């Protein structure tokens, strides 16, 4: 066992003395058992994590009963919703790297034999997953589970995005102070990751398809007693994985990655999933390129539409309708789309995991013969405005905006854009451009939920597009094109735009362009001043110096895979 490094031999007497002092070691027999890290992300700032302390307790008890010695440790987390719209959002994506590094540090410093990862929200799941693949010891993921959708007294279903959009509606006097307060008080009824197909739930669903979590991980509610049972099962499984030395790189292969992207496209997941899955692929040393995604999306039907694409369906409905397993089973009917032989932490193949699943409500999970669209709910756009690509959640774009040409309204930061939207500077037909908000320029590639929600709330969702080198919340909807690469801070073409430039977005053709010649773009860029970092001290200053493009997952410059092709 790896842990023998810190517990076997006369020379490890000091180590054993310290281990005994923790209270976790209760007898000399414990040194013969595998040391299992319970990597928890409990904190009281994130509603998706406020209940994880109890899940950690359950995991520890079950690991001990199964023959392991559990050591719980915590890592940080950021609530994207609370961090939204201020300096805090610049720390959100950057926290992913801190989480990965901190988990790696604890696991390697203490020579743990296996890990039970208990994440839930946006950057915590991918951060832990990056660390797990980096250290490559047996691991299993079991998330905290999704939040229930909220309901107003009149029976209307609401969620966090309802509140953000209500702010825009309130600014136009469409709703009263009291109506806004009613939505605010009912949208988030309890613990769990926010209730739609936002980033947290997207990543926790993808964990099943990647093979690193048990069936049900992505959809069983935080408040459902089955969630505790899932934690127990996962905690027993880690002992099996340690004994068989089944490691995450044995599971997360290229075929598992493609399975996960197929699920992502079928559910119209958050655009952030692309960012995170590319980063995870890098840690697994899989040579996967951004440009491959459109070919996969082209053969993956969009069969499960969930909030924010529709307020009629939330994650609890997906669970009731059969969950991720039912979606994967339906997709498996398409020849060659999924690799059902992919191994999983259950000890079974993906095909065996989903064999008993069924669609229980075709209004929630459609069949492949009756999809919302024949192609997936996410797409990568290319053109002279995004030579290295940009990402759009096609499943949340209204039909009228799938093709759009309009004049640019350019803003060099998110705050100015929000002000412009609220002050009616933005008119129907415009293309809002928010730049210098990329991984380096932001820094931290902040989410644009506030401006997209303001656009929707002010009734402009069917007539205004927004493009940015930043990113979007999983809750954003509308013609929102993000991750524009190269970013403005790297002198990408988006930096050359001026007010009035005509921008054409053609989502079916997967293109995004500005009506300028290459020469004109280059001439404008040559006249730009050298980019001046916005933050010059602390973690974000270091992050900005090391972070790479969104098209490589915004990973740090420590890998041979981090340069765009």
UniProtKB/Swiss-Prot annotation:
Reaction catalysed by this enzyme: (2R)-2,3-dihydroxy-3-methylbutanoate = 3-methyl-2-oxobutanoate + H2O; (2R,3R)-2,3-dihydroxy-3-methylpentanoate = (S)-3-methyl-2-oxopentanoate + H2O
Class of this enzyme: lyase
EC number of this enzyme: 4.2.1.9
Keywords noted in UniProt: 2Fe-2S, Amino-acid biosynthesis, Branched-chain amino acid biosynthesis, Iron, Iron-sulfur, Lyase, Magnesium, Metal-binding
Disulphide-bridged cysteine pairs: none
Cofactor binding, note field: Binds 1 [2Fe-2S] cluster per subunit. This cluster acts as a Lewis acid cofactor.
Pathway(s) this gene product operates in, as recorded in its UniProt entry: Amino-acid biosynthesis; L-isoleucine biosynthesis; L-isoleucine from 2-oxobutanoate: step 3/4; Amino-acid biosynthesis; L-valine biosynthesis; L-valine from pyruvate: step 3/4
One CC-aspect GO term: cytosol
Alphabetized InterPro entries for the sequence: Dihydro-acid_dehy_C, DihydroxyA_deHydtase, DiOHA_6PGluconate_deHydtase_CS, ILV_EDD_C, ILV_EDD_N, IlvD/EDD_N
Binding annotation for Mg(2+): 80, 122-123, 447
A GO term for molecular function: 2 iron, 2 sulfur cluster binding
Binding site for [2Fe-2S] cluster: 121, 194
Annotated catalytic residues: 473 (proton acceptor)
Cofactor (UniProt): [2Fe-2S] cluster; Mg(2+)
GO terms, biological process: isoleucine biosynthetic process; L-valine biosynthetic process
Pfam family, one: ILV_EDD_C
Function of the molecule: Functions in the biosynthesis of branched-chain amino acids. Catalyzes the dehydration of (2R,3R)-2,3-dihydroxy-3-methylpentanoate (2,3-dihydroxy-3-methylvalerate) into 2-oxo-3-methylpentanoate (2-oxo-3-methylvalerate) and of (2R)-2,3-dihydroxy-3-methylbutanoate (2,3-dihydroxyisovalerate) into 2-oxo-3-methylbutanoate (2-oxoisovalerate), the penultimate precursor to L-isoleucine and L-valine, respectively.
Known partners and oligomeric status: Homodimer.
Listed name of the protein: Dihydroxy-acid dehydratase
Species: Chlorobium phaeobacteroides (strain DSM 266 / SMG 266 / 2430)
Gene: ilvD
